[in-house]
């Protein structure tokens, strides 16, 4: 589901770049991190609340699980609406703060304000991507997400390719897709269905909400930090390469969304199983899930890295083939950036795994170091030490540093959760 959700931005980028030019393309890429920032509450309540719901189900408390589920959906909708209003009011100031040039400013404000219309459905869509597998209906979530993504693609073709509406058309297509993705699950749960989660009467339980926030703090930190770091990348790239740097980085990010979404999607999808087995104290199965997941992520990591290196030229041609200088910069940057895919999946899974175990603190530490501290240091330090081109390796170095922390957490917590890949035999008596 995460992969299909990321297609929204990928398709928008293709049509905006090829049908409107690199100035509007750069404008969209400049404001995109802020727009993604508005939806992070869905990740926090989704992953953090999902861990509580799955554990509650594992304990056999079905009605309580339904109450928590309904409460978190309602709360997410309320917060999503507040973020929509805040986004609309602050958009011009945000665009100026991000350093938009005079040519980019109006385009960025216009695109941002249209996208803000679907902030509430977008947060709900992210939330339900966590809850539908727990409800025993992952196929429903996938079906809805595919329909939303296909709708977005068709409308992009019509609005941007045929009607020539430019970024207005691209934004309208995305808003429509996100509304389908976020509101369709609401109607599904309101109708008669066979899922293990149901809407029901509830009272706000601030203790549970607080626990969900703590559990989901790592995912919140991951997404907040990613947006902040992307803004910093854009600032550095504007200084080093100008408009071309932001456009090249944007091209990489569109495909990065898809690749990272594969890791996030797997981590979120496996979380209910982890939470359930943790709640039922099935430690043997918990270790089995962990080991198999590491193997799956390893295969994904190698495949994605090879694909990125080999297809960098084709990707750049699709997006920015109309500008030779921008094309060459994008190919070089993408190949350097793609080395991070060998590592990133393990860190994402490690953080999500601890969230599913209701250990929000360790999960948050991993996410904070990976997505904020290490990347900020690298994005500023590496260009100073090795030259401007080293900025494209900042994420790889940051992921390597995080991997060391993730592995140390796994081995130090082995006695509590039985996580180690190395079998530790019980001492004979």
What is the meaning of each model-derived region?
Residues 1-19, 33-48, 52, 77-84, ...:
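N-terminal transmembrane alpha-helices
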Residues 25-85, 122-141, 248-312, 344-366:
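Small-residue-rich hydrophobic transmembrane alpha-helices
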Residues 7-25, 95-102, 158-165, 224-254, ...:
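Helix-terminus/linker motif at the lipid-water interface of multi-pass membrane proteins
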Residues 53-118, 162-217, 274-340, 381-425, ...:
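Short alpha-helical transmembrane segments in multi-pass integral membrane proteins
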Residues 2, 14, 51, 92-93, ...:
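Transmembrane alpha-helix boundary and packing residues in multipass membrane permease domains
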Residues 1-12, 114, 148, 177-181, ...:
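Transmembrane helical elements of multi-pass membrane transporters/channels
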Residues 46, 115-133, 144-152, 170-183, ...:
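Short runs within selected transmembrane alpha-helices of multi-pass transporters and secretion channels
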């Amino acid at each position: 589901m995460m992969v299909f959700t990321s297609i929204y931005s990928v398709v928008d980028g293709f049509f905006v770049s090829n049908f409107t030019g690199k100035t509007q393309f750069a404008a969209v890429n400049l404001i995109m991190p802020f727009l993604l920032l508005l939806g992070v509450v869905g990740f926090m309540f989704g992953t953090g609340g999902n861990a509580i719901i799955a554990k509650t189900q594992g304990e056999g408390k079905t009605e309580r699980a339904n109450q928590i589920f309904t409460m978190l959906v309602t709360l997410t909708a309320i917060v999503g609406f507040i973020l929509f209003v805040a986004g609309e009011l602050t958009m011009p100031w945000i665009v100026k703060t991000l350093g938009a040039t005079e040519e980019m400013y109006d385009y960025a404000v216009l695109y941002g304000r249209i996208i803000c219309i679907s902030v509430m459905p977008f947060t709900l869509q992210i939330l339900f991507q966590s809850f539908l597998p727990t409800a025993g209906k992952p196929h429903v979530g996938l079906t809805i997400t595919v329909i939303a993504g296909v709708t977005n693609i068709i409308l992009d073709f019509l609005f941007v390719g045929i009607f020539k509406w430019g970024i207005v058309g691209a934004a309208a297509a995305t808003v429509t897709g996100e509304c389908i993705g976020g509101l369709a699950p609401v109607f599904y749960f309101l109708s008669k269905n066979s899922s293990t989660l149901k809407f029901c009467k509830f009272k706000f339980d601030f203790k549970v909400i607080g626990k969900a926030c703590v559990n989901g703090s790592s995912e919140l930190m991951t997404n907040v930090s990613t947006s902040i770091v992307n803004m910093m990348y854009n600032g550095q790239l504007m200084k080093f390469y100008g408009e071309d740097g932001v456009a090249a980085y944007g091209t990489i990010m569109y495909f990065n969304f898809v690749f990272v979404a594969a890791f996030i999607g797997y981590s979120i999808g496996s979380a209910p199983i982890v939470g359930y087995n943790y709640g039922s104290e099935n430690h043997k199965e918990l270790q089995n899930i962990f080991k198999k997941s590491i193997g799956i992520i390893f295969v994904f990591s190698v495949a994605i890295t090879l694909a990125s290196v080999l297809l960098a030229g084709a990707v750049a041609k699709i997006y920015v083939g109309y500008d030779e200088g921008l094309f060459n910069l994008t190919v070089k940057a993408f190949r350097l950036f793609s080395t991070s895919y060998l590592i990133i999946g393990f860190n994402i899974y490690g953080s999500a795994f601890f969230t599913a175990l209701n250990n929000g603190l360790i999960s948050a530490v991993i996410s904070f170091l990976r997505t904020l501290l290490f990347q900020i240091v690298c994005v500023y330090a590496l260009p100073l030490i090795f030259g401007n081109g080293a900025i494209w390796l900042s994420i790889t170095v940051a992921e390597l540093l995080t991997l060391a922390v993730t592995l140390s957490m796994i081995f130090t917590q082995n006695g509590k959760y039985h996580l180690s890949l190395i079998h530790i035999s019980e001492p004979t008596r």
